[in-house]
Amino acid sequence: MSIVTKSIVNADAEARYLSPGELDRIKAFVTSGESRLRIAETLTGSRERIIKSAGDALFQKRPDVVSPGGNAYGEEMTATCLRDMDYYLRLITYGVVAGDVTPIEEIGLVGVREMYKSLGTPVDAVAQAVREMKAVATGMMSGDDAAEAGAYFDYVIGAME
């Protein structure tokens, strides 16, 4: 839930106007909109490069994943791994645009650790894949944008650990 919606819901539940603090938070959210959209455009427009570079780095650091018996062994399974990376990058983009981790949590992280464990997927490798995407993506951004985007990558990584 965005800060705008959350503030309105809270104020309405108490039958009151928005407080000065709530208005300040909404103003900050609106003011940061341009940078959040710029970050989302960078992530979206560079997604193929981010996924490919991060995938290459992951497979170099974790050769066990693409070796016989590994979860990304073979063309089909490697493609599945890259598809999952794309999925997490998309979720991160949603969070950036919303200015909140709620879309990430509600759309994609509920029960993810348990699902990966049941499939025999090494969760630490998934977390490493997100770390690699963070490194590539934030390397394409200014310091402030990288810090903003990095927080959403870190949220996903934390959910995997």
Swiss-Prot record:
**PANTHER family, per the entry:** ALLOPHYCOCYANIN ALPHA CHAIN, PHYCOBILISOME 32.1 KDA LINKER POLYPEPTIDE, PHYCOCYANIN-ASSOCIATED, ROD 2-RELATED
State the UniProt keywords alphabetically: Antenna complex, Bile pigment, Chromophore, Electron transport, Membrane, Photosynthesis, Phycobilisome, Thylakoid, Transport
Work out whether the entry's keyword set contains Membrane: yes
PTM summary from the entry reads: Contains one covalently linked phycocyanobilin chromophore. The chromophore on position 81 is added by the phycocyanobilin lyase CpcUS.
Gene that produces this protein: apcA
Q: Which Gene3D superfamilies match?
A: Phycocyanins (1.10.490.20)
**Species in which this protein is naturally found:** Picosynechococcus sp. (strain ATCC 27264 / PCC 7002 / PR-6)
Any idea where this protein resides? Cellular thylakoid membrane
Its subunit composition reads: Heterodimer of an alpha and a beta chain.
Q: What is this protein called?
A: Allophycocyanin alpha subunit
* A Gene Ontology BP annotation from the UniProt entry: photosynthesis
* Assigned protein family: Belongs to the phycobiliprotein family.
Q: Where does (2R,3E)-phycocyanobilin bind?
A: C81
User: What does UniProt give as GO cellular component?
Assistant: phycobilisome; plasma membrane-derived thylakoid membrane
For membrane topology, the record states:
Peripheral membrane protein
What does this protein do, in the record's words?
Light-harvesting photosynthetic bile pigment-protein from the phycobiliprotein complex. Allophycocyanin has a maximum absorption at approximately 650 nanometers.
Top-rank lineage group of the source organism: Bacteria
Do you know which InterPro entries this protein is assigned to? Globin-like_sf, Phycobilisome_asu/bsu, Phycobilisome_asu/bsu_sf
